[in-house]
Amino acid sequence: MFHSVDVLSGRILYSKEAQAWPDFERQLAALRRAQQAFAARPVIERAALLHDLADKLAQARSRLAEMVCEEVGRCLRECEAELDKSVALIRYYARLAPQLLAHKTIATQASLSQVRFEPIGVVLAVMPWNYPVWQVLRFAVPALCAGNACLVKPAPSVARVTAALFELVGEHLPFQAAWLDHDDTLRAIEHTDAMAFTGSTATGRRLAAHAGQHLKKSVLELGGSNAFIVMPDADLAAAAKEACYSRFRDAGQSCNAAKRIIVAEAVADEFVPLFLAECAKLQMGNPMDAATTLAPLHREDLRARVHAQVQDALAHGARALCGGQLPRGSGW
């Protein structure tokens, strides 16, 4: 079952049943037929359809941004920025596709040598919840430009905005959602032509291993523990401001957030108060409120995990210089 939940109230906003495997097989067969017809069209025609999608996405900006805000929990202005970035991405690839995909003649010892770009077929993407519009389009748009069909298995907790996005896509692009449970997602890898995944390292290992067993191409973007490093000659005020932004932007729920802040010992005593002063400026609250700068976490279990990590660190000798307690009020 796919559920979208309001991060402030816990209220279920949208529910969708996972599709049965025979339904997916029929969907995949139809998508393969659509992909063949789509790939036969000139690149400029495929690009025109993507420009149309960009127009629709721009028109739906406010509505989709509010959905992302409610479901994911990020501040509304951050969700609006996600929509703007997504529109720009579509226009970028649609504009450059004829140039990027043009056949190229290259010099070799043969009488004629060319580089030609051919579609793979149907590509499956297993996508995360943190940027439910951007992550899907970042994967799909270049693949569509190249004449592929795209199937997206969304994260269960962003079902509503995913459904709204695919309503905009319509029937002119071979680009659909696959509402699969975990086991059927593994089976889908076997029946599609390539797989893309964004998410945790542990899940990426499992999916990549399954793709490898069936000789399917895979592209992975996996989680990390990025370090923000402050050197002795840094502008400490600027570094403190950027460190706070990098750690707490999108409530810290992004792959490129500063997971660790490493400060040269020579400047640590000076840096820490500057960083704490920046943290003190953060305003927790309703992510729809323009005054809010620190939005809720996405799910209750994620908040519980973060709190447990803080308590474990304190139990092992760490000191909490600010925060350290669960905030009162609604939301996570």
Which residues are covered by each model-predicted region?
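Hydrophobic face of alpha-helices
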Residues: L28, A47-A54, A65, V87, ...
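N-terminal Rossmann-like NAD(P)+-binding subdomain of aldehyde/semialdehyde dehydrogenases
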Residues: M1-S111, H298
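Structural signal for hydrophobic packing residues in well-ordered secondary-structure cores
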Residues: Q35, A39, A54-R61, A65, ...
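Residue-level signal for inorganic ion chemistry
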Residues: G10, R46, V68, I90, ...
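Short phosphate-engaging motifs
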Residues: D23, A60, L64, S86, ...
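ALDH superfamily catalytic-core signature
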Residues: A202-W332
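A conserved hydrophobic position in a structured secondary element of the catalytic/binding core
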Residues: V5, G199, V263
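Rossmann-like NAD(P) dinucleotide-binding subdomain of oxidoreductase/dehydrogenase enzymes
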Residues: A102-A238
